[in-house]
Amino acid sequence: MIALIQRVSSASVTVEGNIIGEIDKGLLILLGVEQGDDEQKATRLCERVLGYRIFADDDGKMNLNVRQAGGNVLVVSQFTLVADTQRGMRPGFSRGADPSEADRLYQYFVEQCREQGVHTETGQFAADMKVALVNDGPVTFWLQT
């Protein structure tokens, strides 16, 4: 399971012209689910993402996690994160989880975020989404379990 996390001042996701998820300060989490991923990996990745210290403390050092910084999260499914890009000019997606399993684990990840007490907004699994963000920094990290 892969999470591309971006520290944002704001972010939103739109489907068919309607904003379905929106946050101010926090993390935009683009989530990719691979074959072999399970609830244990999703739980571990959620703990890492929510505990990752990428917000500035009073001394300006990256020393606070999203909870300590009073931030929110917006979780958006993105199967292209699991693409095989090693050869050729076209990505392959054979490493991606079956769509029904990917959706289940995506929803599980979202619930884990909520159970950790973080306000969590979402995109819509498998929809054509428009994601807007103001990247703060920019600060972007790739986490994988």
From Swiss-Prot:
Keyword DNA damage set for record: no
Reaction catalysis annotation: glycyl-tRNA(Ala) + H2O = tRNA(Ala) + glycine + H(+); a D-aminoacyl-tRNA + H2O = a tRNA + a D-alpha-amino acid + H(+)
GO cellular component terms listed in the entry, alphabetical order: cytoplasm
Subcellular location: Cytoplasm
Gene3D superfamilies, A to Z: D-tyrosyl-tRNA(Tyr) deacylase
GO BP term (any one): D-amino acid catabolic process
Enzyme Commission number: 3.1.1.96
InterPro entries, alphabetized: Daa-tRNA_deacyls_DTD, DTD-like_sf
Listed SUPFAM superfamilies: DTD-like
Highest taxon, organism lineage: Bacteria
Motif Gly-cisPro motif, important for rejection of L-amino acids: positions: 137-138
GO terms, molecular function: D-tyrosyl-tRNA(Tyr) deacylase activity; Gly-tRNA(Ala) deacylase activity; Ser(Gly)-tRNA(Ala) hydrolase activity; tRNA binding
Keywords associated with the record: Cytoplasm, Hydrolase, RNA-binding, tRNA-binding
Disulfide bonds: none
NCBIfam families: D-aminoacyl-tRNA deacylase (TIGR00256)
Subunit note: Homodimer.
Stated role: An aminoacyl-tRNA editing enzyme that deacylates mischarged D-aminoacyl-tRNAs. Also deacylates mischarged glycyl-tRNA(Ala), protecting cells against glycine mischarging by AlaRS. Acts via tRNA-based rather than protein-based catalysis; rejects L-amino acids rather than detecting D-amino acids in the active site. By recycling D-aminoacyl-tRNA to D-amino acids and free tRNA molecules, this enzyme counteracts the toxicity associated with the formation of D-aminoacyl-tRNA entities in vivo and helps enforce protein L-homochirality.
Domain comment as written in the entry: A Gly-cisPro motif from one monomer fits into the active site of the other monomer to allow specific chiral rejection of L-amino acids.
Family, as annotated: Belongs to the DTD family.
This protein's name: D-aminoacyl-tRNA deacylase
The species this protein was found in: Pectobacterium atrosepticum (strain SCRI 1043 / ATCC BAA-672)
Lineage: Bacteria, Pseudomonadati, Pseudomonadota, Gammaproteobacteria, Enterobacterales
Gene name of this polypeptide: dtd
